[in-house]
Amino acid sequence: MPHILIKTWFPPHKADEVANVYMEELKSHRPDRSLGKSLATSIKSDQNGIVSLEIFEVKEGKLEEVLTHYHDVQIMYHNIEGFRYEIEVWRTPVEALALLGMKPPE
Protein backbone atom coordinates (compact mmCIF):
# COMPACT_ATOMS: atom_id res chain seq x y z
CA MET A 1 0.00 0.00 0.00
CA PRO A 2 1.56 3.32 -1.02
CA HIS A 3 1.77 6.31 1.25
CA ILE A 4 0.68 9.83 0.37
CA LEU A 5 2.67 12.66 1.96
CA ILE A 6 0.90 16.00 2.10
CA LYS A 7 3.21 18.86 3.06
CA THR A 8 2.00 22.43 3.50
CA TRP A 9 3.76 25.72 4.26
CA PHE A 10 2.27 29.04 5.30
CA PRO A 11 3.43 32.30 6.89
CA PRO A 12 3.10 32.52 10.68
CA HIS A 13 0.84 35.58 10.44
CA LYS A 14 -1.68 33.42 8.52
CA ALA A 15 -1.89 30.73 11.24
CA ASP A 16 -5.34 31.79 12.49
CA GLU A 17 -6.73 31.81 8.95
CA VAL A 18 -5.26 28.37 8.20
CA ALA A 19 -6.55 27.00 11.52
CA ASN A 20 -10.08 28.19 10.70
CA VAL A 21 -10.02 26.47 7.31
CA TYR A 22 -8.57 23.35 8.94
CA MET A 23 -11.46 23.24 11.41
CA GLU A 24 -13.86 23.42 8.47
CA GLU A 25 -11.89 20.67 6.70
CA LEU A 26 -12.25 18.40 9.73
CA LYS A 27 -16.02 18.77 9.54
CA SER A 28 -16.50 18.35 5.81
CA HIS A 29 -13.56 16.63 4.10
CA ARG A 30 -12.23 13.76 6.18
CA PRO A 31 -11.38 10.81 3.93
CA ASP A 32 -13.56 7.74 3.96
CA ARG A 33 -11.90 4.93 5.95
CA SER A 34 -12.44 2.68 2.93
CA LEU A 35 -9.66 4.68 1.22
CA GLY A 36 -7.02 4.09 3.91
CA LYS A 37 -5.90 5.76 7.11
CA SER A 38 -3.87 8.69 8.34
CA LEU A 39 -0.70 7.45 10.01
CA ALA A 40 0.58 10.78 11.32
CA THR A 41 -0.01 14.51 11.17
CA SER A 42 2.72 16.80 12.52
CA ILE A 43 3.41 20.53 12.57
CA LYS A 44 6.61 22.53 13.04
CA SER A 45 8.06 25.91 12.17
CA ASP A 46 11.20 26.63 10.18
CA GLN A 47 12.73 29.41 8.07
CA ASN A 48 9.87 29.03 5.55
CA GLY A 49 7.13 29.56 8.14
CA ILE A 50 4.83 26.93 9.57
CA VAL A 51 5.01 23.47 8.03
CA SER A 52 2.56 20.59 8.35
CA LEU A 53 3.04 17.04 7.20
CA GLU A 54 0.47 14.26 6.95
CA ILE A 55 1.24 10.67 6.03
CA PHE A 56 -1.72 8.69 4.69
CA GLU A 57 -1.62 4.94 4.02
CA VAL A 58 -3.65 4.17 0.89
CA LYS A 59 -5.66 0.97 0.55
CA GLU A 60 -5.09 -1.17 -2.51
CA GLY A 61 -6.69 0.29 -5.65
CA LYS A 62 -7.66 3.59 -3.98
CA LEU A 63 -4.72 5.82 -4.99
CA GLU A 64 -6.60 7.97 -7.52
CA GLU A 65 -9.50 8.54 -5.11
CA VAL A 66 -7.11 9.55 -2.32
CA LEU A 67 -5.20 11.95 -4.60
CA THR A 68 -8.46 13.54 -5.73
CA HIS A 69 -9.58 13.89 -2.11
CA TYR A 70 -6.38 15.62 -0.98
CA HIS A 71 -6.30 17.95 -3.99
CA ASP A 72 -9.90 18.93 -3.22
CA VAL A 73 -8.91 19.61 0.40
CA GLN A 74 -6.00 21.84 -0.61
CA ILE A 75 -8.32 23.95 -2.79
CA MET A 76 -9.99 25.05 0.47
CA TYR A 77 -6.75 26.92 1.32
CA HIS A 78 -6.11 28.58 -2.07
CA ASN A 79 -7.29 32.03 -0.97
CA ILE A 80 -4.78 32.19 1.88
CA GLU A 81 -1.87 34.33 0.75
CA GLY A 82 1.44 32.48 1.00
CA PHE A 83 -0.11 29.03 1.47
CA ARG A 84 1.73 26.34 -0.50
CA TYR A 85 1.41 22.58 -0.63
CA GLU A 86 2.94 19.47 -2.12
CA ILE A 87 1.42 16.01 -2.46
CA GLU A 88 3.78 13.09 -3.02
CA VAL A 89 3.25 9.37 -3.56
CA TRP A 90 5.79 7.16 -1.78
CA ARG A 91 6.14 3.41 -2.15
CA THR A 92 6.77 0.99 0.67
CA PRO A 93 10.05 -0.97 0.52
CA VAL A 94 8.14 -4.08 -0.63
CA GLU A 95 6.53 -2.09 -3.48
CA ALA A 96 9.88 -0.59 -4.47
CA LEU A 97 11.51 -4.03 -4.56
CA ALA A 98 8.64 -5.31 -6.73
CA LEU A 99 9.52 -2.64 -9.32
CA LEU A 100 12.91 -4.35 -9.57
CA GLY A 101 11.31 -7.77 -9.89
CA MET A 102 12.38 -8.68 -6.35
CA LYS A 103 10.67 -9.47 -3.08
CA PRO A 104 12.03 -9.49 0.45
CA PRO A 105 12.90 -12.81 2.08
CA GLU A 106 10.15 -14.36 4.15
Regions flagged by a language model, labelled:
Residues D72-Q74:
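Charge-dense, low-complexity polyampholytic segments
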